[in-house]
Regions:
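Extracytoplasmic "Venus flytrap"
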Residues: 23-51, 62-71, 165-167, 219, ...
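Short, low-complexity disordered leader/linker segments with a strong preference
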Residues: 1-25, 50, 54
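Structural motif
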Residues: 60-82, 190-205
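Extracytoplasmic/secreted envelope proteins and their assembly/folding machinery
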Residues: 41, 45, 74-77, 93-96, ...
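Beta-alpha junction/loop-to-helix N-cap segments that form part of ligand/metal-binding clefts
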Residues: 66-123, 214-232, 236-241
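Conserved acidic residues
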Residues: 86-88, 156, 210
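An alpha-beta-alpha
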Residues: 26, 44, 133-180
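Pocket-lining segment of extracytoplasmic ligand-binding domains
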Residues: 161, 167-242
Length: 245
């Protein structure tokens, strides 16, 4: 897995807080507000602090949230480039992709990204090159499937709901289909574009599936209660990558 360095190592040599007294500026770009991404944001800042970078002492954060809007992400990227921030923390796959498209010079540390190679953020997950590095939030899908089958051992059809615009979600669904197929289980997909599509997508699976799997997906994580309201009524078990508490 790609490993992010907490200090301003970024994609180059390690640079500790004691090396310079100057104030550094870090742009933090978050795709949308939900529990998992909020925790990643706080964790990054805490990691920086553990390396000696204290907010308003030797590091200044420019925190931006795109509210799940691609045009907002592009504006945030241009803001960071124009302001010549020293480092960008990109939270979620679409965020990292937008930041990487905007600059090849500013180091980018990404988090809440499932697969850097699939997202075209790196040539290899094991050996990142260029200005992007980070951590992966890939689910143990094989273990999740085993758990689902323990809960609902008679499962023959699994429904999955995910965002059609997130390559990280498609990757996880492809893995699920392979693992489930090896067990003779069918996977039925229902994709969404926005949170407004979730209820209809969930209803489309009722009567067709025995259980539901939701990958790590930003659209889904921000509105899991909408899906669960449907699956609870239909008495369908749900296994998910993450959800906003």
């Amino acid at each position: 897995l790609l490993m992010a360095v907490g200090a301003l190592a970024g994609c180059g040599g390690e640079k500790k807080a004691d090396d310079s007294k100057k104030m550094v500026t870090v742009g933090i770009a978050q795709l949308v507000e939900h529990g998992a991404l909020d925790a990643a944001n706080k964790g990054f800042v805490a990691g920086m602090a553990s390396k000696g970078f204290k907010e308003n002492e030797n590091v200044k954060y420019d925190r931006q949230n795109a509210q799940a809007d691609q045009s907002n992400l592009q504006n945030i990227a241009q803001r960071f480039v124009s302001n010549k921030v020293d480092l960008i923390c990109a939270i979620a796959t679409p965020t990292a992709q937008t930041m990487a498209n905007a600059t090849k010079d500013i180091p980018i540390v990404a988090t809440a990204v499932t697969d850097y190679e699939v997202a075209k953020l790196a040539a290899s997950n094991s050996e990142p090159k260029g200005n992007v590095t980070g951590t992966s939030d890939m689910n143990p899908i094989d273990q999740q499937l085993e758990l689902l089958l323990k809960i609902a051992p008679q499962t023959k059809n699994i429904g999955t709901v995910y965002s059609s615009s997130e390559v990280n979600s498609q990757l996880q669904v492809d893995v699920l289909k392979k693992l489930a197929g090896d067990k003779g289980i069918n996977v039925i997909e229902a994709t969404v574009s926005t949170v407004n599509d979730i209820q209809q997508a969930a209803h489309s699976l009722v009567g067709k599936v025995d259980a539901v799997y939701v990958p790590t997906d930003n659209v889904m994580a921000s509105s899991m209660p909408t899906l669960v309201a449907v699956t609870d009524e239909a008495r369908l078990p749900v296994i998910c990558g993450e959800s906003d508490p």
